UniProtKB/Swiss-Prot annotation:
Pathway per the UniProt entry: Amino-acid biosynthesis; L-arginine biosynthesis; L-arginine from L-ornithine and carbamoyl phosphate: step 2/3
GO MF assignments: argininosuccinate synthase activity; ATP binding
GO terms for biological process, alphabetical: argininosuccinate metabolic process; L-arginine biosynthetic process; urea cycle
GO cellular component, one term: cytoplasm
Originating organism: Rhizobium etli (strain ATCC 51251 / DSM 11541 / JCM 21823 / NBRC 15573 / CFN 42)
InterPro entries, sorted: Arginosuc_syn_C (IPR048268), Arginosuc_syn_N (IPR048267), Arginosuc_synth (IPR001518), Arginosuc_synth_CS (IPR018223), Arginosuc_synth_type_1_subfam (IPR023434), AS_cat/multimer_dom_body (IPR024074), Rossmann-like_a/b/a_fold (IPR014729)
Keyword ATP-binding on entry: yes
Top-level lineage group: Bacteria
Protein name: Argininosuccinate synthase
Amino acid sequence: MASYKDVKKVVLAYSGGLDTSIILKWLQTELGAEVVTFTADLGQGEELEPARKKAEMLGIKEIYIEDVREEFVRDFVFPMFRANAVYEGVYLLGTSIARPLISKHLIDIARKTGADAIAHGATGKGNDQVRFELSAYALNPDIKIIAPWRDWAFKSRTELLAFAEQHQIPVAKDKKGEAPFSVDANLLHSSSEGKVLEDPAQEAPEYVHMRTISPEAAPDKATVIKVGFRKGDAVSINGVEMSPATLLATLNTYGRDNGIGRLDLVENRFVGMKSRGVYETPGGTILLSAHRAIESITLDRGAAHLKDEIMPRYAELIYYGFWFSPEREMLQALIDKSQEYVEGEVTLKLYKGNVMVIGRESEKSLYSDKLVTFEDDQGAYDQKDAAGFIKLNALRLRTLGKRNLAK
């Protein structure tokens, strides 16, 4: 076990669930530390008052429960979506992007309360331990961090349940009496891991999905919506302006009702192993399609292609936990500059798990129907100019061809 003998007061990222409830008791009994709890309302869709009551039952005096939904979407989700960020081609980073925000608040509360350490419930096998701790160290290089999963004797969720029963800690269970799926949820997404999901050859049971109906059960009639953008961020739906969190929640509803946003993924964790997860990102899936569509008419080709080139690196930085790194901030500045004229409206058709762009318009559009028309363009473009363009671009290819044919 790491040495925590100098730790007197700890701020715990507390959900009220299995891991963090036992960690709370462990911090009290094993370390003798005073515990402060922090619970973030990230839009996970559950009442947070039970977490407060459970913390009080366990003897906690300083309890912080904060609604961070607007901050989450405005300062973390939207900047990420300006980049069209996806990890390994498909994952919209719903869990990854929430971790730096939680760490930020843990550090703030530690400063307010005079705590000398923070603690989290991430396991020693996953990415979240890295994300929490890299963010925390970036914001407070001297903070002590306690990660009980790396130190205590428990090796499984079964042992945790036994400990919880021994200490009379109430823990939710499924109908079979087993611990629930490992679930993470926020306003952007939900993820499920563990139990039958650990076999990547087996289809995930329908009951795993919490945020969406199945595409097969979605309405037979398509839903058409319009999403408005300003400087790269979504600001309205069907002409009605909304706050960032309200807008994402509204897109979630549209996505849920049309079976949009399901993903069954085996991903490469930062720590080196592969893991299987079932993700649901209904609103984010719609938002990504809409954002790429508005960029298609407002971004110059060179800018658009450069964004596509740097996106995998940007997404990887978020996935690995480097949100507060200088390289992520440098890339963000470039991305934000690209969004200066990304404004307008995108029309989308939602149907049985599909998001189809059917229209896009912008006062800043670079699309010119006069240039691309198959009809008389009234002299807007002289097709003879293409001959010289092709000849110059073919120069090196012709030179290479002559050499190769001379063999």
